[in-house]
Regions:
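An N-cap/entry alpha-helix motif that binds or orients negatively charged groups
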Residues: 13-56, 120-125
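Conserved, mostly hydrophobic/aromatic
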Residues: 26, 69, 91, 132, ...
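Glycine/Thr-rich beta-alpha phosphate-binding loop at enzyme active sites
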Residues: 35-49, 182-196, 235-290
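Short beta-strand/loop segments at the ligand-binding rim of alpha/beta enzyme cores
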Residues: 62-68, 141-149, 210-225, 286-296
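Catalytic cores of alpha/beta
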Residues: 78-83, 163, 225-239, 286, ...
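Glycine-rich phosphate-binding active-site loops on the catalytic face of alpha/beta enzymes
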Residues: 92-101, 180-182, 244-252, 306-333
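A gly/proline- and charged-residue-enriched helix-loop-helix capping module
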Residues: 94, 99-142
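C-terminal helical cap(s) of enzyme catalytic domains, especially alpha/beta-barrels
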Residues: 100-116, 256-269, 324-347
């Protein structure tokens, strides 16, 4: 009750009206309108919450806080500057493919209000690496920006696609993510298999050797993996010396959902995948002995849930669905709650809490 009251008080009247308007529209139209409003500067900012206890270093990068915006919200790097004003510790744009593509037929985005969830089957719709790289070249110098790498649906060589996008855009970003876990591009998840994954990551990592510009490379995996598959992924990650693993993408599973859209094809995100994605996170932390930085994603709406992800093994955590249901002020709310929760549990800073509760999820 207290959290709900705080959320209502912390949300401005304009944000309440804006959310009500957007949620009355078709989900994809609402999303596009939100991006346009951000670009035009007509979305009011919320006070940015800062605390020394939330600062940390991951993969050679210094983050003001561990809360990031997941890929998929700003697919084409159109609204980086206004998004940074909401207090995110980092933002990931994309996924971006070599050539522009329209993605899957509409409708392809569904709000599951009763479940506080979303199902999407976008299929890597984006403007292509050339247009996106030009936008990234004009990004603000402050803040940490990552790029989610994708492959074209009709590509004859998807492994080369990832490397091509990386080479084209890497000088403009602070990290890059190899996304082989989207369920909306046919056969993409097959690249998570040991042999294919090693070939892919070696190809992308080799681009680092050919250039003076080196940025951390992360791998984004699916939540629908068994322990043996996670062990293989951890082994390949260690062999190829990538800088981190993002766990997890959306799921193809359905968890006793209430919405009429529950049977729509696509990837499910939001509250229903919190436990599954957090368990995968904890398994990876255990398998890797905490030696590979992990970025948690899936179902985080509160500071307490962010804290649970961190205790399960995440150094950083990303959100998306929370913005759809709670607005941009949710970032400040979550960070304030995390700061207080750390203190209440006796942690001096966020780094002290990483992985301390991983065993509870195994």
């Amino acid at each position: 009750m207290g959290v709900i009251l705080y959320q209502r008080l912390s949300m401005s009247l304009s944000e309440k009206i804006g959310l009500r308007l957007l949620t009355s529209l078709d989900p994809e139209k609402a999303h596009n309108l939100a991006i346009r409003a951000l670009k035009l500067g007509i979305v009011s900012n919320t006070p940015v919450f800062k605390s020394k206890a939330l600062e940390l270093n991951v993969a050679g990068l210094k983050f003001n806080n561990p809360l990031g915006l997941a890929a998929g919200f700003d697919k084409n790097a159109e609204a980086i500057k206004p998004l940074m004003n909401f207090g995110f510790g980092f933002i990931e744009v994309g996924a971006v493919t070599p050539n522009a593509q329209k993605g899957n037929p509409k409708p392809r985005l569904f709000r599951l209000r009763e479940d506080k969830a979303i199902i999407n089957r976008f299929g890597f719709n984006n403007d292509g690496m050339i247009k996106v790289s030009k936008r990234l070249s004009r990004r603000p110098s402050n803040g940490i920006i990552g790029l989610n790498l994708g492959a074209n649906k009709t590509s004859a060589d998807r492994i080369s696609d990832f490397a091509t996008v990386f080479k084209t855009c890497k000088e403009f970003v602070d990290f890059a993510t190899v996304n082989v876990s989207s369920p909306n591009t046919e056969n993409l998840r097959e690249l998570q298999a040991h042999k294919e994954l090693r070939e892919l990551l070696n190809k992308v990592m080799s681009c680092q050797n050919d250039s003076k510009i080196k940025v951390p490379i992360f791998l984004k995996i699916a939540p629908d993996l068994k322990k043996g598959e996670l062990e293989n992924i951890a082994l390949v990650a260690s062999e190829t010396k990538i800088d981190g693993i993002i766990a997890t993408n959306t799921t193809t599973s359905r968890y006793n959902l209430k919405s009429i859209y529950q049977h729509e094809q696509g990837g499910l995100s939001g509250v229903p995948i919190f436990e599954t994605s957090t368990r995968v996170l904890a398994q990876l932390y255990s398998i890797t002995d905490g030696q590979i930085p992990l970025i948690g994603v899936g179902g985080v709406f509160t500071g307490e849930q962010l804290f649970q992800k961190i205790r399960a093994g995440a150094s950083l955590v990303q959100i998306y669905s929370a913005l759809i249901y709670s607005g941009f002020s949710v970032t400040t709310k979550i960070l304030k709650e995390l700061d207080l929760t750390l203190k209440n549990h006796g942690f001096k800073n966020v780094e002290e809490a990483i992985g301390t509760g991983a065993k509870e999820w195994l």
